[in-house]
């Protein structure tokens, strides 16, 4: 380790430009492929969808040859832009413009027939539409939670987020939106008419995304196949004998998870995790002691915490034990629609980058959740 004096003696130049190993497009390609692992991939996809590009979402792996004769393998989540499906779009020029804006690799394929896995014309290539996303706001809804999601979608993905005041929901045609996000807040003031409005939209094909305490309302409404455990579970766990009035601040503090890192076991084959990680574990940033338990149904749980999940920061041992083996991510069908539950603030303050793409996946990958 260098001392400050030794470090000052190092002759170095500032980095003013980041060199990216970009992949030039080949004009004779049959199709182009955008892998999903890059953090900028959602922004590129949003840009192309806004320009009317026909996009196919890969839901199974495949291997093919590029126009230079290289053999390339692609994981689920890769986006395919087929030249034949884009007769009204100058695809080559549009993709090059996107590459100029976002230095990222887009690969050129020589043929629609693959060496291994699905072909480009397979029904496992799902068509994607431009998402139209709204989030409930208003009295009783956490502005911090809304702001964190808005910041990610607006500044990093370039996806416009519509703010819907829940008190004016009756005046809104929800069919104008593909996704609706519900964050921490109070929603018991939504009357039966507005509840039925959301449920009808959901059953007809909408995607409902819940986060943190917004999940309590989704569970109470019977839309979420998971149960939010009572706050008394945490309160009782940290209660100690002979507690006095002077101990009340300690008692309250022990219940809090005010910003610590917890490790979850994840399913990297699940659409919510495509392009996020290839590992079996992923650290989540927790800011609450919310406990979610998914129903005992196959494949709806995309992530759950390890037995003793705390890896950084402080969480009372009793609460850490309670968090262990509870659910972090859930996704399932509801009629023709989908419900996605995200326990933690995956876009917390715009700096916890490891989980931020889960929000993008909840939007762009939702057609693959079956």
Protein language model features and the residues they cover:
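Intrinsic-disorder/low-complexity accessory segments
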Residues: 1-370
């Amino acid at each position: 380790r260098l001392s400050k004096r030794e470090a000052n003696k190092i002759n170095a130049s500032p980095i003013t430009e980041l060199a990216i190993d970009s992949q030039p497009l080949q004009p004779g390609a049959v199709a182009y492929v955008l892998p999903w692992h890059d953090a900028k991939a959602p922004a590129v996809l949003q840009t192309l969808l806004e320009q009317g590009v026909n996009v196919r979402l890969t839901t199974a792996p495949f291997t093919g040859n590029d126009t230079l004769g290289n053999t390339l393998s692609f994981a689920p989540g890769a986006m395919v832009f087929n030249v034949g499906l884009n007769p009204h779009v100058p695809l080559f020029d549009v993709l090059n413009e996107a590459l100029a804006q976002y230095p990222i690799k887009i690969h050129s394929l020589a043929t629609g027939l693959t060496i291994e896995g699905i072909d480009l014309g397979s029904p496992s290539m799902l068509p994607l539409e431009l998402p139209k996303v709204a989030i409930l706001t208003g009295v009783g809804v956490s502005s911090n939670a809304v702001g964190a999601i808005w910041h990610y979608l607006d500044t990093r993905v370039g996806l416009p987020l519509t703010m819907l005041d829940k008190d004016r929901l009756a005046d809104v045609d929800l069919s104008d939106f593909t996704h609706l996000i519900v964050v921490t807040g109070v929603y018991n003031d939504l009357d039966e008419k507005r509840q039925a409005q959301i449920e009808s939209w959901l059953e007809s094909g909408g995607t409902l995304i819940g986060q943190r305490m917004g999940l309590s309302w989704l569970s109470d409404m019977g839309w979420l196949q998971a149960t939010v455990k009572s706050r008394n579970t945490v309160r009782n766990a940290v209660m100690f004998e002979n507690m006095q009035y002077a101990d009340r601040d300690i008692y309250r503090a022990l219940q809090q998870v005010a910003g610590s890192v917890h490790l979850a076991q994840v399913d990297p084959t699940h659409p919510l995790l495509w392009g996020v990680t290839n590992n079996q574990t992923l650290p989540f940033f927790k800011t609450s002691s919310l406990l979610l338990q998914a129903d005992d149904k196959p494949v709806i749980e995309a992530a759950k915490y390890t037995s003793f999940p705390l890896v950084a920061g402080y969480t009372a041992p009793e609460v850490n034990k309670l968090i262990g083996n509870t659910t972090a991510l859930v996704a399932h069908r509801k009629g023709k629609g989908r419900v996605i539950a995200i326990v933690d603030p995956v876009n917390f303050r715009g700096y916890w980058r490891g989980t931020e793409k889960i929000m993008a996946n909840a939007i762009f990958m939702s057609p693959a959740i079956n």
